[in-house]
Curated annotation (Swiss-Prot):
One of its GO terms (biological process) is threonyl-tRNA aminoacylation. This is Threonine--tRNA ligase. Coiled coil: none annotated. GO terms for cellular component: cytoplasm. PROSITE patterns: AA_TRNA_LIGASE_II, TGS. The lineage of its organism: Bacteria, Pseudomonadati, Pseudomonadota, Gammaproteobacteria, Legionellales. Zn(2+) binds at residues 333, 384, 510.
Amino acid sequence: MPNVKLPDGNVKHFEAPLTIYDVAHHISPGLAKAAIAGRVDGVLVDTSYLIKEDCSLIIVTEKHEDSLEIIRHSTAHLLAQAVKALFPSAQVTIGPVIEDGFYYDFAFERSFTPDDLSLIEAKMHELAKANLSITRRELPRNEAIQYFKDLGEEYKAKIIADIPENEALSLYRQGDFEDLCRGPHVPSTGFLKAFKLTKVAGAYWRGDSNNEMLQRIYGTAWADKKSLEEYLFRLEEAEKRDHRKLGKALDLFHFQDIAPGMVFWHPKGWTIYQELEHYMRNRLVDFGYQEIRTPQLVDRSLWEKSGHWANFRDEMFVTETENRHYAVKPMSCPCHVQIYNHGLKSYRDLPLRLSEFGNCHRCEPSGALHGLMRVRNMVQDDAHIFCTEDQIQSEVAMMLELVQSVYKDFGFTEIKYRLALRPEKRVGSDDVWDKAETALKLAMQGRNIEWVDAPGEGAFYGPKIECSLSDCLGRIWQCGTIQVDFSMPARLEASYVAEDGSKQTPVMLHRAILGSFERFMGILIEHYAGKLPLWLSPVQAIVLTISEKQNEYAEKVRKTLQKRGIRANFDLRNEKIGFKIREHTLQKIPYLLVVGDKEVENCQVAVRTRDGIDLGVMTIDTICDTLTQEIIRKGSI
């Protein structure tokens, strides 16, 4: 009879098989009432799961880390049940859990409207309030296919037809609705208390643009209403901060159908871009990098040698001229090896740090493009370090120092690190992998960095560190990468003469900090809601006149600011000063310098910030010094 080991180490002995719900009830009726699911010997199962043998058990409640995925998956089924109740001719397809929520795809003769979503959500609340029991049963594959065909659910039958014949399938029923699912699910619909449908969009069946278009309804679900409200607030804030809206409102950039996924930078947006590049260039010089430039169009022979032609061909833009095939480079790594290979290298030349603001193109699907966050033409802050195995740790430690310093200057202090470790299929010996993984760990320990191991998630050619930023809304953005590469240098015949005179292959370290300039700018715009730090603002100060009598003085102030390296402008229009202040505040200009007759007489300016703070009257030299010091301090403000 089963002995059940609980998380606190206690072992409960039972005289007969029993369900997880029964175990919870044995501990306390309150726990039984709160139980959502269980984890038996590490596997998530329903509370109705029958325990027959000795096992370890964790009872999952709303407070457990596993609860949200179960709640969201169950809510996706609740959505499908509501849609079928309101629109019986709709066919169900798939309904997975995604970050912060779920979606469900439906085949329906028309697009769902916002009014439809309101009706569906109301029906979901009705079904949740009914507290319908959720039960599980198994069916053989062929029976399941016929079952769904009889229901008129052709898409579901097609999904099951792709499953191996000998596999038993589980179905979950709630009320008169039953759906295919591995589970687990909450015990009843009454556990689903806090959810919201967020939007509807089109989606191709099985993600193939050659297939029919389905209707995808997105939603979010949480354990309680407070968490839901907090999430919806963050969602509302994210909508306000959408870099695409702010890019238009602040006249930074735009996109056009004539060049999908490629940015048209306006003067102010390009100013920010140039400031980013200037900043990164200076930091790289400080850390001993040599900047290079490599071609945009490269013969396919190089991509074949590097392995990109076989594995990345569909994402490359390819052209043909004079009977030769070329690819627009999707990444800079193979070209950097060509520069390394130009001339004999000795161990004394290592480490060799090469950097490039690499202009890359990738043929991303049009449906995946998303403002600056997902583009086809991006500039990456690429760097490749060629070194010996013994130099990996010191080089990675130096990279981490640079990563932390750069992110701090941009105002990001909460960084998450992930170490992707060896996969099953890999190149290189275990000894080499041991050495590389240990070097990465020691480098992070040396910087007092905490990280999460990701076993099996490294590339086949080496382990890597992923660096992710947390923005003001708590969203995580993976930007930086430090990747060890044992493969490409050998594939492209890179070598150096070792101290003993032998010919050796260097290790190649791929390194990016921003990731791509475009995406990083999108992150910055949303993080700061367009109110970029002074040093990044395209216009740092604007001089506003009260009347045309101050025009000459305003020009003098602007020129003085510009001579001090401050990006300044003026507004001489014959408009009320309140109108000017409001307009330039909406443009997120950090400092508004108002000049009237009194300021002209005393060679001063009245200083206001974009947040409406009155800093009083200052001399021109004082405001120049104030702004210059703030610019120098960068993200530490």
